[in-house]
Amino acid sequence: MTEPRIAPTRTFAARPHSTGLVVHDPLTGLTHRAGTELASGRVRLSDTDVASLPEIHPAAMQADVPISVCWSPLVRCNLACPHCLDDKSVPELARPDRYRIAHLLAESAVLGVDISGGEPLLLRELPVLIDILVAGGSAVSVTTNGTHLARRAEALAARVDAVRISLDGPDAERHDHWRGTGSFDRAVAGIRAAVAHGIPTQIQTVLLRSTAWASVRPMVELAAALGVYGVTFLQMLPIGEGAVLADAEQLTDDEATELLAELNTTSAVPVRLRTREAAGGFTVIRADGHVWRNQPDAHAINSLRPLLSINDLALTARDGSA
């Protein structure tokens, strides 16, 4: 069994806050409280050092702007997953507006930007968007279905700080049931390419009632075999295209917590649960260029305003976690 290929150091983003210096991890989406000896901005740190730092939920920081955001610059996708968070009726802005939003985020105090979709690897200008964000000091990740990752991994390796690949099952039968024939093999090929090019890589899996109990352990074992950094299990959010599945497929946060507490594996791969409660208040910039924010219970998402200036990112309630 292959264990995670962990580089001596990787890139995080740090800045001072009223609660002390904080460090955002672009791979896991977690935020940590750090000592004052760290520099602000993009910093190289070891996983061991960061793992030893206490986690702090963004809501506890009472910041003026989100610690991290998800930016979905496009709706287009080569797959049609029934549990997708995105709303396919949202219009897409043109390329110049995507550049404008990238520059706005780069000028803000947001520490982490996760570029999602749709399928972000369909964007030809993705490397340029990443470069703009990195130049502004953000830690940048890309969340992808992985089917185009093998051909784009080399170009991403010199730019992006982390990739998160969505898998819905530990094998082709279970994954392809949700994402279509052949999608598992292409996603795994993408994971292998990302790992081979030295990109910090993790698997993300949405917990679904019909599959969770049989899939959690083999998913962690697959992650170990592929040499990724970790697995994050995400509580299903009843928003976007996936809202119609909520009644049948949602687990409660207590059920999800108990499920992972009972996980029995010898793998050293780190495992994390992102609960629905933790996602309450999380900020998303959708393809229409509007700032959207999860409701406090993360059972719905609201459009707040167009993102025209940094002030439009302002928090009016608790921040949420990726």
Task: Label each residue range with its predicted role.
Residues M1-A7, F12, S166, D176-T283, ...:
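Radical SAM enzyme [4Fe-4S]-AdoMet core and its adjacent flexible, acidic
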Residues M1-K88, E277-Q295, I310-D319:
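N-terminal pre-core extensions flanking Radical SAM catalytic domains
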Residues D25, L45-S141, T147-R151:
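Conserved alpha-helical substructure of the radical SAM core
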Residues G29-A34, R44-D47, L74-V75, R124-L126, ...:
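A broad, low-specificity signal for short, low-complexity segments enriched in glycine/proline
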Residues A34-R42, I67-S72, R95-R98, S116-L122, ...:
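Short low-complexity stretches enriched in small and charged residues
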Residues P82-H83, E173, N302:
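Short small-residue beta-strand/loop micro-motif enriched in glycine and branched aliphatics
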Residues R98-I115, L123-L234:
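Radical SAM/AdoMet-radical enzyme domain recognition
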Residues I101-L104, L307, T316:
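Generic alpha-helical secondary-structure signal
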